[in-house]
């Protein structure tokens, strides 16, 4: 369950395979160049602030009915902020990794999920996957009340939360207030409901479901 970054064996791929025929629109935030969703037959919106990742992803074989490649990150506000290439993160991971990448930092673009939804007239998002190396809560907050139009959310948790100074319960409480429940770890054997939200900083993926969602992903 913890500290397995291989999506094929840590439960991520199995979870997606379980829901893919029940969903139509995906937001892949922090897609890099190796998104699993290029093989999804529906609509996918890809987001990554690193232009190299987006350009490489565009070259991959893609069966999406509609693919939207966005060379910016998502966050709480529209701005430029420093990105640390060694960590592929908007946080310099000096707390969890003890080594600074400040000498290599670059300014990259961030926009809000709310503005993207409004500007592109998006009515519903079935699956929001967030892999942003510590920027998860920033991404989530950027949707504001439009997050209620999302059915399923998956986000990473781990050592990056030492760097962003966020507690897991902060994310849980925010999403609960927005109508999400059934917070669960993805594991190689399926999902496991979380009963203890104390911080352990072990790498894992967490999923939750909007209470208004009629499909049962797990």
What are the functions of these language-model segments?
Residues 1-218:
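Phosphate/nucleotide-binding beta-alpha loop and adjacent structural elements of enzyme active sites
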């Amino acid at each position: 369950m913890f500290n397995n970054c291989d999506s094929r064996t840590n439960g991520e791929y199995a979870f997606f395979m379980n829901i893919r025929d029940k969903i139509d629109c995906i937001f892949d935030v922090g897609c890099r160049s190796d998104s699993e969703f290029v093989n999804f037959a529906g609509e996918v919106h890809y987001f990554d602030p690193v232009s190299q990742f987006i350009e490489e992803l565009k070259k991959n074989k893609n069966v999406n009915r509609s693919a939207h490649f966005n060379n910016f990150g998502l966050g709480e506000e529209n701005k430029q902020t420093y990105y640390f290439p060694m960590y592929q993160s908007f946080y310099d991971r000096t707390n969890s990794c003890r080594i600074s990448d400040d000498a290599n930092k670059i300014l990259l673009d961030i926009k809000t999920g709310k503005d993207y939804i409004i500007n592109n007239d998006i009515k519903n998002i079935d699956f929001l996957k967030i892999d942003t190396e510590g920027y998860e809560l920033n991404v989530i907050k950027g949707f504001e009340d439009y997050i209620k139009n999302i059915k399923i959310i998956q986000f990473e948790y781990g050592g990056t939360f030492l760097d962003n100074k966020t507690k897991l319960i902060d994310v849980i409480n925010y999403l609960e207030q927005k109508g999400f429940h059934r917070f669960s770890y993805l594991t190689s054997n399926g999902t496991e409901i979380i009963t203890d939200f104390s911080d352990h900083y072990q790498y894992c993926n967490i999923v939750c479901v909007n209470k208004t969602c009629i499909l049962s992903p797990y």
